[in-house]
Amino acid sequence: MAKLTVKDVDLKGKKVLVRVDFNVPLKDGVITNDNRITAALPTIKYIIEQGGRAILFSHLGRVKEEADKAGKSLAPVAADLAAKLGQDVVFPGVTRGAELEAAINALEDGQVLLVENTRYEDVDGKKESKNDPELGKYWASLGDGIFVNDAFGTAHRAHASNVGISANVEKAVAGFLLENEIAYIQEAVETPERPFVAILGGSKVSDKIGVIENLLEKADKVLIGGGMTYTFYKAQGIEIGNSLVEEDKLDVAKALLEKANGKLILPVDSKEANAFAGYTEVRDTEGEAVSEGFLGLDIGPKSIAKFDEALTGAKTVVWNGPMGVFENPDFQAGTIGVMDAIVKQPGVKSIIGGGDSAAAAINLGRADKFSWISTGGGASMELLEGKVLPGLAALTEK
């Protein structure tokens, strides 16, 4: 990566602004998954060990109006972070103003402060999400000219708390998490050890058109599963029953199949049910066709075997999107089968592109078997598409 990283700058005695991704799920004010906080620890610890004063920025959920602020405070995150670091985290509970400035100016070397949810600034004219130049300038003024971006999850967005601050500091650098994310995903796509197999699931073809197009050029094989299978089926005239389909994407699916030259591998059977919820019958289809009155909710056993074979000997695998409705035990065999087929390959570099696939690996107990699990669904998708991420582009060149 030809950008400066946190190791390239002198941090001692400096007020260091850090964009982290603490957008964690909360239930009744309790954090239900703290992965993103844990992922940010190496960068935060490095800054304070070097004698820097870490000033952290993050968003949490969406905040459009005053009423949305309830339940979207970063207070529970500050408490969780303090426990993980084993030291106090200063939390003024505001995003700007005299109270925040005083708290920052009172920091000593090695201390940590967390600014309140940056999206609180969206209540008045979406200042954070629309990268209001004055807000970026103000937040940049709170530090000593160094900004560390460690929030891969928002790197595909141009917000005041990443691109806005970057534009107003002397040095904008990458944190360890951002550096690793880029290294794993970009390297996998641009300079993979071959054979390179990509696996794409999820419900919509429309979400993945750019990714499929880019990966058809880069990968040796592209395996398709999940709900988008049925748009590809219908494009070929295969019966899909009541399965999910994007009628307006049939031509796109047809064009992708023609362009693929056999690289695109589709499931050969499905697990079908007579309803999405409250079904009374679940069975495997004979072949590709889904029965009338039924809908496909997972890939079937023949497809799992076919994908297992397609993955044999793979050295690089990028996976984005589950094979079926994995949250339901009746329809998780496809996702489990594909995960197991990936991780059993000797010496494979296996990467999960965030989002639902990451949740599937964690919930189904396979997370520790993968080389890398991305913290950013949307950002990793854009990297897989070959796009330039604004949050990354805004960093200082080496």
Curated annotation (Swiss-Prot):
GO biological-process terms attached to the record: gluconeogenesis; glycolytic process
Compartments where located: Cytoplasm
Family, similarity comment: Belongs to the phosphoglycerate kinase family.
GO MF annotation: an example: ATP binding
Residues making up the signal peptide according to the UniProt record: none
Oligomeric form and interacting partners: Monomer.
Keyword Kinase: yes
PANTHER family from the UniProt entry: PHOSPHOGLYCERATE KINASE, PHOSPHOGLYCERATE KINASE 1, CHLOROPLASTIC-RELATED
PROSITE patterns per the UniProt record, alphabetical: PGLYCERATE_KINASE
Pathway given in the UniProt record: Carbohydrate degradation; glycolysis; pyruvate from D-glyceraldehyde 3-phosphate: step 2/5
The keyword Kinase appears for this protein: yes
Reaction it catalyzes: (2R)-3-phosphoglycerate + ATP = (2R)-3-phospho-glyceroyl phosphate + ADP
UniProt protein name: Phosphoglycerate kinase
UniProt-annotated binding residues for ATP: 208, 296, 327, 354-357
Catalytic activity, EC: 2.7.2.3
GO cellular component annotations of the record: cytosol
UniProt KW keywords: ATP-binding, Cytoplasm, Glycolysis, Kinase, Nucleotide-binding, Transferase
Domain of life: Bacteria
Binding-site positions, substrate: 21-23, 36, 59-62, 119, 157
Pfam families per the UniProt record, alphabetical: PGK (PF00162)
